[in-house]
């Protein structure tokens, strides 16, 4: 039951019958109901007003349209398993039973006392409804039939949607066989090369790695199967580039395999000089260092120019020169080792200082969070039961909801007075795929553990007014508003045993997201939600049971 309530004036209500009918219709989807917080709520897409959808009325299109006398005042659909009350009203059996258990033993239309055992089947209405003509709900089907024959028709209707067992998509029954055999991306096929079974959509990836698929050599353009290609590159391909066989001695030339023989013939003298330089390096290197020489590094030995004559033994370095060079290297190593020790010590000191600073920063962050929480708590103490929740960045929340990601946020806690009950609000943007509540704003109130819980009577008794404020500038301002009375028998209003009661109380379909565009409910990307709580009992000075005031002892 959503209403538009102007702040500037109060509109007169409709007749009692219309009001009662609206209240009854709200019991199913559009009114307050006990709802778990997201950690314990039903999955998104499941109607939170009923755990099993089938027990509601018949949600089909009648031809001609359904008469109001056959409509359930609760679910607003055609009566299913119609029952009648002593006061003459008809309901779906499941709808009225749930209403009696959740909302109390009274008729949702006229509030007359009503017990479950007073309900009796209305076979006349049931027979009349089953005889009404309905249209097939399958898109493309134009057949009509009596309601009693609808289920049998759906089992045979070629336009009825059925699920593909391979890709879980929905398709008309007439197209399912063609889809599964020729169109489904998950249909089973076999690789023509290796015979491996796979899904059709995986074939493109398999073709890139299939070991028996034919591929073309990028050098000689020979066609071979993929698993033969490595050996072809390394041994057979005449066009593949290979290094010179003297690359370990310093030759950096690369050529095609069929040009290797010519290269060896043309560069014979150069290869001999490279080998000579390598041997000469061995003769001048201490024995302990010979093992450190790598023959795999072509840059280690530079080729000798062709104009350079062979080295004469008199040009070779003496033993004294080698000893002096060794001493110089040792001194350099000692200096570097000392520098390394000093730098290691400095690094350890810097790490210790950084850890100290990190600890200090974490303590400051904790202090800041604590102060922020205290500031919010102070604001909650002084709201006196009228709390306005400012939600910034609402467009970002809507974008997340459009991506089928759940959006659930909680407000800071606030008190109904001092002393008073501590409450908070929960806002939930229903996903586009949710049944019967898609794209709705859900709004709930949760009790929280507060400072005065031991001084207050439980459960909570009072009236709660929830509003989404209109931020338009003008004389006429229309807030989206709902008013509800607490229900002491629900867990949502019992004294909480955790920081926040997991049970909430409010509206699954408080306001549709499209309604936000009709007025300026969102301004500067900000939405305002107002909650006003009126406690029915005097919680400021509760009278204890059995307390008797004592008269004074007299003047002294």
Curated annotation (Swiss-Prot):
Which segments does the entry list as coiled coil?
318-356
Write out the entry's keywords from A to Z. Answer: Coiled coil, Cytoplasm, Lipid droplet, Metal-binding, Nucleus, Repeat, Transferase, Ubl conjugation pathway, Zinc, Zinc-finger
Q: Which InterPro entries match?
A: MATH/TRAF_dom, TNF_rcpt-assoc_TRAF_met, TRAF-like, TRAF1-6_MATH_dom, TRAF6_MATH, TRAF6_RING-HC, TRAF6_Z2, Znf_RING
- Keyword Transferase among record annotations: yes
Q: Which domain of life is it from?
A: Eukaryota
Q: What is its EC number?
A: 2.3.2.27
Where is the protein found, in the record's own terms?
Cytoplasm; Cytoplasm, Cell cortex; Nucleus; Lipid droplet
Residue ranges covered by zinc fingers (TRAF-type):
152-204, 205-261
Quote one Gene Ontology molecular function term: ubiquitin-protein transferase activity
Q: Which PANTHER family match?
A: TNF RECEPTOR ASSOCIATED FACTOR, TNF RECEPTOR-ASSOCIATED FACTOR 6
What name does this protein carry?
A: TNF receptor-associated factor 6-B
> What is the source species?
Xenopus laevis (African clawed frog)
What gene name is given for the protein in this entry? traf6-b
């Amino acid at each position: 039951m959503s209403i538009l309530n102007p702040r500037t004036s109060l509109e007169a209500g409709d007749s009692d019958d219309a009001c009662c009918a609206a209240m009854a219709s709200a019991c199913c989807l559009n009114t307050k109901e006990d709802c778990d917080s997201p950690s314990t709520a039903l999955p998104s897409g499941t109607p939170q007003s009923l755990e099993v959808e089938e027990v509601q009325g018949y949600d089909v299109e009648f031809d001609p349209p359904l008469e109001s006398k056959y409509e359930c005042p609760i679910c607003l659909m055609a009566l299913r398993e119609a029952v009648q009350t002593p006061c003459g009203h008809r309901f779906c059996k499941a709808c009225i039973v749930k209403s009696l258990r959740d909302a109390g033993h009274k008729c949702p239309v006229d509030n007359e006392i009503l017990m479950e055992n007073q309900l009796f089947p209305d076979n006349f209405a049931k027979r009349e409804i089953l005889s009404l003509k309905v249209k097939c709900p399958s898109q493309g089907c134009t057949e009509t039939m009596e309601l009693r024959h609808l289920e049998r028709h759906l089992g045979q209707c070629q336009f009825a949607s059925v699920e593909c067992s391979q890709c879980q998509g929905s398709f008309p029954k007439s197209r399912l066989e063609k889809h599964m055999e020729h169109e489904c991306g998950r249909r089973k096929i076999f690789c023509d090369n290796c015979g491996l079974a796979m899904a059709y959509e995986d074939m493109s990836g398999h073709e890139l790695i299939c070991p028996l698929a034919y591929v073309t050599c990028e050098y000689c353009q020979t066609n071979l199967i993929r698993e033969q290609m490595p050996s072809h590159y390394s041994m057979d391909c005449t066009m593949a580039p290979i290094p010179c066989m003297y690359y370990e001695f310093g030759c950096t030339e690369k050529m095609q395999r069929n040009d290797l023989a010519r290269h060896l013939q043309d560069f014979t003298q150069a290869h001999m000089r490279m080998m000579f330089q390598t041997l000469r390096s061995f003769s001048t290197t201490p024995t302990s260092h010979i093992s450190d020489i790598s023959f795999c590094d072509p840059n280690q030995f530079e080729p000798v120019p062709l104009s350079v004559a062979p080295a004469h033994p008199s040009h070779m370095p003496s033993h004294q020169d080698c000893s002096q060079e060794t001493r110089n290297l040792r001194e350099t190593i000692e200096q570097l080792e000392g520098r390394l020790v000093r730098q290691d010590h400095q690094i350890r000191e810097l790490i210790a200082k950084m850890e100290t600073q990190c600890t200090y920063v974490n303590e400051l962050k904790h202090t800041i969070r604590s102060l922020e929480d205290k500031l919010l708590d102070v604001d909650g103490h002084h709201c006196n039961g009228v709390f306005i929740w400012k939600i910034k960045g609402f467009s970002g929340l809507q974008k997340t909801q459009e991506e089928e990601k759940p959006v659930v946020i909680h407000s800071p806690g606030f008190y109904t007075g001092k002393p008073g009950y501590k409450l908070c609000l929960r806002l939930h943007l229903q996903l586009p795929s949710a049944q019967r509540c898609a794209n709705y704003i859900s709004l709930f109130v949760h009790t929280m553990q507060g400072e005065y819980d031991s001084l207050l009577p439980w459960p909570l008794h009072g009236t709660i007014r929830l509003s989404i404020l209109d931020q338009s500038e003008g004389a006429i301002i229309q807030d989206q508003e709902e008013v509800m009375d607490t229900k002491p028998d629900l867990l949502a209003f019992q004294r909480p045993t955790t920081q926040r009661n997991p049970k909430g109380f409010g509206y699954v379909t408080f306001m549709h997201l499209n309604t936000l565009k009709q007025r300026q409910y969102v301004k500067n990307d900000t939405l305002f939600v107002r909650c006003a709580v009126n406690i029915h009992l005097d919680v400021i000075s509760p009278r204890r049971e059995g307390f008797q005031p004592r008269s004074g002892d007299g003047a002294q």
